[in-house]
């Protein structure tokens, strides 16, 4: 190549680079995609170690949630406390809030104030949520086993038991979150009422509209008026006769249409959406959150209401905003 030809080639290359720069300025590339799960706090996360099949362990969940921009997760286990696990995960996966708690099934002594007292004292201060009995509650075993089955109760005849009273006092004193588990809807109302009287600030009705506890709208309005939030879990979007997982075929489906109706009747300010995911062969927690957001938007629920249900309400319950 002659010197003249080489100079022409350089000039052409420079012009091409200039054209490319001008094009980039006129038509800049789109901004990086932001996950619909960004900033969300999932207050209902199942993971290994567990006695039930799970698709990820605590570290996997935290790392994936962080990578998708989520603000935090709450680890839930039906048979053991998760405050200690949350504290360790926080050390290994910085940059995401991880909390735990305790579910009051028989493995921890049932309705056991001592278990709650020790849980919230565990090193790291990550023990935040106290769930009432789940698969061993009287409501759960009667619903899925039969009417003659008997399980744990917290407020027979509409009055909380002495043990339940003591637990509410601890929750109020330590500013924990009281989640109602799978107890009877009448027990939910009684516990929320007594909790309010004792000064419990943060009460969450665990997946309130599905099979357990199965609140009707009047009961939902009653507890919402007393300051409780009602949880809706994406897992229940997947439930019903055509559910992808066999155990979900026995649960009542609660989907985005139900959320839209509840938001109209009691307000998004009284609702909280989480995943309740982690089961073997099920989708990941962030995928579930993203799917939930998509379905809520498709149903016409306002972005501001989605922000309230998935970000603001969980943050307030966990003491992350003020």
Where are these regions (language model features)?
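Bacterial N-terminal signal peptides
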Residues: 5-20
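An N-terminally biased module of ancient metal coordination in phosphate/nucleic-acid-related enzymes
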Residues: 25-96
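Histidine/acidic residue-rich metal-binding segments in metalloenzymes
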Residues: 27, 58-63, 83-88, 94, ...
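Hydrophobic faces of well-ordered beta-strands that scaffold small-molecule active sites
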Residues: 41-45, 73-75, 99-102, 130-132, ...
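Glycine-rich phosphate-binding "P-loop"
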Residues: 43-52, 135-137, 142-159
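Active-site environment of divalent metal-dependent phosphoester hydrolases
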Residues: 48-50, 80-84, 105-108, 137-140, ...
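Short acidic/histidine-rich active-site segments
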Residues: 233, 268-285
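Mid-to-C-terminal alpha-helical segments outside catalytic/metal-binding sites
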Residues: 286-322
């Amino acid at each position: 190549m002659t010197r003249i030809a080489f100079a022409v080639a350089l000039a052409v290359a420079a012009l091409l680079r200039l054209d490319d720069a001008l094009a980039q300025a006129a038509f800049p590339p789109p901004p990086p995609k932001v996950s619909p799960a960004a900033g969300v706090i999932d207050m209902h996360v199942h993971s290994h170690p567990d006695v039930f099949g799970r698709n990820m362990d605590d570290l996997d969940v935290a790392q994936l949630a962080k990578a998708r921009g989520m603000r935090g997760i709450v680890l839930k286990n039906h048979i053991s406390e998760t405050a200690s696990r949350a504290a360790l995960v926080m050390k290994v996966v910085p940059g995401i809030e991880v909390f735990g708690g305790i579910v009051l099934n028989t493995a921890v002594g049932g309705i056991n104030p001592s278990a709650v007292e020790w849980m919230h004292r565990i090193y790291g201060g990550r023990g935040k949520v106290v769930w009432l009995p789940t698969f061993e509650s009287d409501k759960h075993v009667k619903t899925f086993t039969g009417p003659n089955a008997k399980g744990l109760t917290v407020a027979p005849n509409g009055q909380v038991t002495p043990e339940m009273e003591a637990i509410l006092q601890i929750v109020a004193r330590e500013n924990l979150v009281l989640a109602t588990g799978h107890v009877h809807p009448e027990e939910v109302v009684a516990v929320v009422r007594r909790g309010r009287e004792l000064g419990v600030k943060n009460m969450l009705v665990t997946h309130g509209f599905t099979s357990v506890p199965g609140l009707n709208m009047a009961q939902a309005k009653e507890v919402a008026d007393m300051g409780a939030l009602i949880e809706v879990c994406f897992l229940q979007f997947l439930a019903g006769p055509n559910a992808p997982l066999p155990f979900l075929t026995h649960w009542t489906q609660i989907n985005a249409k139900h959320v839209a109706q509840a938001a109209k009747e009691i307000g998004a300010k009284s609702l909280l959406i989480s995943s309740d995911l982690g089961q073997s062969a099920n989708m990941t927690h962030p995928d579930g959150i993203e799917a939930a957001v998509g379905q809520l938007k498709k149903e016409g629920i306002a972005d501001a209401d989605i922000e309230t249900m998935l970000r603001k309400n969980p943050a307030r319950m966990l003491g992350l905003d003020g």
